[in-house]
């Protein structure tokens, strides 16, 4: 049995003072930010050898809580420089939006278990499972369950390979498992959220107005990534020459994406929902050589080679019987300044059916001299419709991938 607990606390104070004799004329700012994190973990482990059988197991639970608080004030017109930013009450005005406070509270509870069975120290089967419950997802899907299983075969210990001297290790391994992700969710993403939008007079009294900035989605849940892998590890000459190879395929489902929705029936014009999917596949090879191995000196040479393919499968689907669609072609990165004919400088796009983040560009054949002696770009009409359109249409082509 093992236990672990920790508490982390961080606090930051910021202050700014602009003297009355500079352009800002007595503007002051004061802010305080605090972050607290609690973590507790309890684990139980078991290990038993019975003849040719070996069983090991572990179970653990963990709880993590994170709170963030912030408060800041911006004010104008301090009467004397002697106060600095230590007497905000002496300022003449606090403009709208100059006083803010925020609070964020999120928690995560996890239960994990794993068991491994080994026969003859040759065949090994491992089963793992974890359940994660987060305060950040919807009330209908607080918990996510993520199992995995893997198998390893130590072939070198088989009789038909035992006498092959140069071969010191040969293992085959494969696995299938799931993992969860909440990267696109903040503490209150699943709730209706309002924010101040301005000040209006009501009965001669200034009143702050509020506006909706987020729809609630009680069905929001974990993104799920399912991964399959198969590989081999080979060692030669007492493992001074090592070779590893692995193929993997993963698919992320229930991807989080913000969709445009009608108002009404929704209170706000976008909704975060779990609909999209994406895949990754690849092959990795590793080579390790130890040409020198002496008591006082050792030389290791490592080389790696990998191939990876990514594909955005879909961004459209249904939410409670309502069709949710996203554009098949969406600009996500641009260049500033001159450089493209027409001033449309979007260059990086997400395109359904393509890797996530591709260069989607017009094709320039060169420069054309105009009648007045100036030059302009000669942009190719890729869709052959008689005109060049540099919007996200047919006169662009996929020129490469933005991510390595």
Task: Name every feature range the model reports, one short phrase each.
Residues 33, 371-374:
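Short, 15-30-residue, compositionally biased linear elements
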Residues 275-280, 327-365, 369-372:
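C-terminal beta-signal and terminal closure region of outer-membrane beta-barrel proteins
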Residues 373-375, 380-400:
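Acidic, glycine-anchored loop motifs typical of Ca2+
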């Amino acid at each position: 049995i093992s236990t672990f607990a920790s508490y982390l606390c961080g606090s930051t104070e910021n202050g700014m003072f602009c003297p009355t004799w500079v352009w800002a004329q007595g503007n002051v700012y004061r802010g305080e930010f605090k972050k607290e994190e609690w973590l507790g973990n309890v684990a139980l482990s078991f290990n038993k050898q019975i003849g040719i059988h070996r069983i090991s197991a572990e179970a653990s639970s963990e709880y993590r809580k994170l709170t963030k608080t912030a408060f800041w004030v911006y004010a104008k017109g301090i009467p004397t420089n002697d106060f600095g930013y230590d007497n905000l009450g002496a300022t003449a005005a606090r403009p709208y939006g100059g006083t803010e406070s925020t609070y964020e509270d999120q928690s995560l509870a996890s239960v994990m278990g794993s068991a491994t069975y080994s026969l003859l120290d040759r065949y090994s089967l491992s089963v793992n499972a974890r359940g994660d419950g987060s305060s950040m997802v919807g009330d209908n899907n607080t918990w996510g369950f993520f199992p995995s299983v893997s198998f390893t075969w130590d072939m070198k210990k088989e009789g038909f390979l035992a006498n092959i001297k140069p071969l010191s290790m040969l293992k085959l391994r494969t696995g299938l498992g799931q993992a969860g992700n909440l990267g696109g969710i903040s503490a209150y993403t699943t709730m209706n959220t309002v924010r101040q939008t301005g000040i209006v007079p009501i009965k001669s009294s200034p009143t702050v107005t509020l506006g909706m900035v987020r729809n609630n989605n009680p069905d929001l849940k974990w993104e799920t990534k399912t991964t399959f892998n198969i590989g081999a590890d080979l060692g030669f000459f007492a493992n001074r020459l090592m070779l590893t190879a692995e193929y993997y395929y993963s698919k992320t489902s229930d991807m989080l994406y913000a969709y445009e929705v009608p108002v009404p029936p929704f209170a706000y014009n976008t909704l975060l929902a779990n609909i999209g999917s994406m895949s990754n596949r690849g092959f990795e090879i590793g080579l390790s050589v130890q040409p020198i191995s002496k008591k006082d000196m050792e030389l290791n040479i490592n080389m790696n080679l990998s191939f990876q393919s990514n594909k955005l499968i879909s961004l459209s689907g249904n939410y409670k019987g309502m069709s949710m669609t996203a554009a098949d072609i969406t600009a996500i990165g641009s260049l500033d300044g001159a450089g493209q004919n027409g001033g449309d400088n979007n260059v990086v796009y997400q395109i359904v059916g393509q890797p996530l983040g591709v260069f989607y560009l017009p094709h320039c054949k060169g420069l054309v001299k105009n009648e007045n002696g100036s030059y302009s770009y000669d942009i190719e009409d890729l869709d052959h419709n008689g005109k060049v359109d540099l919007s996200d249409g047919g006169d662009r082509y996929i020129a490469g991938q933005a991510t390595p």
